[in-house]
């Protein structure tokens, strides 16, 4: 079986299981149990592989807890970031899942033990609270202990039945792909609420490629509103292992999504010392001010959310916002995220940020921020994307590309909203690989393409009140039928002549009838 076929079959199976085991429970509400169980299996098998070290004589899952040497425990915590004793492994819990009357409390104790194993170590912040959303006492599992255990057992046995093969034989990231597949499906089915934490992979790939263009290596990659981490992971997939020296950095305000992001890092084989995901409000409580700058910033922040803005008089003196001389409006924080990203961007780096289109043409504070960005030559490109690419919204959003190392003062505008840049599917439009390739090529070339792309000098933008809407600069193709007026007039004349002839013939017939 080819690796891609294996992946497709695995994903079909895991979605079938996810729907079967949830029963009448809404899939969105049940997602943490399926995702958490998949993660539990992954770290168990990953941990076994590490302990056994490829030695066929070592069978860690069959060992007694007390037989694990203390030096092995210390090494595992230092290297992997956590400890899982043999009895706590997924495979051993799954053996007796249907017959264990204490399954829910045993699982809770195991998850707590894994988290406690990192206490006081470098990995603590990556492990602490990781299983917080896997509530084994939740009423979503059932109304009594027996019902809860049956549903937990069904999830565990379902995940156990999935064929991931052995870690050493994986040609593709099966666990990570399965997790991303589940998140994607949950997001698609949840509509608007799902779109808040997941950026579709095709859009993520475009954003990552824009941010990384021309960079063979980057010091660190950062997403200030990282959701489930999908954008950060696209950077990993594009650059591969070892290229990002300082790792992956992100901040997320939603606790459940924050845990999904941390699990996602582990599931894609990013070790605890290579990722930094923080919980909190990026705009009011940024966590990585001492860790900037970043060579690559990718982000799909929430659109037009409210924030305190001018309600907090200290923010105008914040080094992120002060240079613009004005704060983003209280009702629309979009440019606050943009200015935050700009402040964290290195002199050699690039930021690619998804933006609501209104920020590019509205007046007031947003116009002043646009002026600051353009006058200081930070805006490299604005790209208008097709509509209906994201879950939960049909809005045609834009991508703003920021750079601090532009070779000239021109700003590029690309209109990728037309049908030549997407494929229409049942519920959403999709960017195919050829669409992404063409967009990146146009972005890289900076050449004018009729009806698609143009580069505009600073003066022209200033004279247009710093409007950065793509439609203000890229002429839309007139797809109406071209009419040949001379030919049309000739045809009209012939038709009139024919009508006159017919009218004369009719008059002659009437005369004959009256005679």
What are the residue ranges of the model-derived segments?
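Generic marker of residues within folded, mature protein domains
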Residues: 168, 240-241, 267, 390, ...
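N-terminal hydrophobic or amphipathic segments with adjacent small-residue motifs
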Residues: 30, 221-223, 255, 346, ...
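Tryptophan-centered motif/residue detector
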Residues: 15, 28, 258, 307-308, ...
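Non-catalytic, mostly N-terminal accessory regions of nucleic-acid modification and defense proteins
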Residues: 1-206, 210-211, 215-216, 273-284, ...
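Conserved S-adenosyl-L-methionine
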Residues: 193-299, 304-315, 320-325, 335-336, ...
């Amino acid at each position: 079986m080819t690796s891609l076929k294996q992946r497709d079959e695995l994903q079909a199976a895991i979605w079938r299981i996810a729907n079967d085991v949830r029963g009448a429970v809404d899939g969105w509400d049940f997602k943490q149990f399926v995702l958490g169980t998949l993660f539990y299996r992954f770290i168990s098998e990953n941990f076994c592989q590490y302990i056994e070290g490829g030695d066929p004589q070592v069978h860690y899952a069959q060992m007694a807890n007390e037989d694990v040497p203390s030096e092995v425990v210390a090494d595992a915590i230092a290297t992997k970031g956590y400890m899982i004793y043999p009895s706590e492994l997924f495979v051993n819990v799954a053996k007796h899942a249907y017959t264990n009357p204490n399954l829910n409390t045993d699982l809770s104790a195991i998850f707590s033990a894994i988290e406690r194993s990192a206490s006081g170590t470098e990995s603590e912040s990556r492990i602490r609270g990781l299983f917080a959303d896997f509530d084994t006492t939740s009423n979503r599992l059932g109304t009594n202990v027996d019902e809860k255990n049956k549903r937990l057992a069904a999830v565990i046995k379902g995940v156990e039945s999935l064929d991931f093969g052995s870690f050493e034989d994986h040609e593709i990231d099966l666990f990570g792909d399965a997790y991303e597949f589940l998140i994607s499906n949950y997001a698609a089915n949840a509509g608007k609420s799902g779109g808040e934490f997941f950026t579709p992979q095709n859009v993520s790939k475009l954003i990552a490629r824009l941010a990384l263009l021309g960079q063979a290596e980057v010091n660190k990659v950062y997403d200030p509103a990282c959701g489930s981490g999908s954008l950060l992971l696209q950077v990993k997939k594009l650059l591969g292992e070892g290229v990002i020296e300082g790792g992956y950095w992100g901040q997320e305000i939603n606790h459940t999504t924050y845990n999904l992001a941390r699990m996602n890092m582990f599931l894609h084989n990013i070790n605890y010392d290579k990722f930094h995901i923080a919980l909190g409000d990026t705009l009011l409580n940024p966590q990585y001010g001492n860790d900037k700058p970043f060579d690559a910033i990718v982000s799909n922040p929430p659109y037009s959310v409210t924030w305190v803005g001018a309600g907090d008089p200290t923010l105008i003196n914040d080094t992120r916002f002060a240079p613009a001389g004005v704060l983003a409006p209280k009702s629309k924080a979009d440019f606050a995220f943009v200015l935050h990203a700009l402040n964290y961007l290195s002199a050699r780096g690039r930021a690619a940020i998804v933006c609501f289109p209104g920020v590019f043409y509205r007046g007031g504070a947003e116009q002043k921020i646009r002026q600051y960005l353009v006058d200081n030559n930070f805006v490299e490109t604005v790209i208008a994307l097709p509509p209906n690419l994201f879950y939960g919204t049909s809005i045609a959003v834009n991508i703003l590309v920021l750079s601090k190392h532009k070779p000239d003062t021109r700003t590029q505008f690309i209109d990728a909203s037309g049908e030549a840049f997407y494929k229409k599917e049942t519920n959403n439009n999709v960017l195919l690989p050829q669409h992404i390739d063409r967009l990146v090529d146009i972005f890289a070339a900076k050449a004018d393409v009729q009806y698609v792309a143009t580069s505009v000098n600073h003066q022209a933008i200033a004279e247009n009140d710093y409007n950065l809407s793509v439609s203000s600069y890229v002429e839309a193709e007139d797809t109406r039928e071209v009419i040949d007026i001379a030919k049309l007039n000739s045809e009209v004349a012939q038709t009139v002549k024919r009508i006159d002839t017919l009218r004369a013939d009719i008059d002659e017939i009437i005369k004959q009838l009256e005679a």
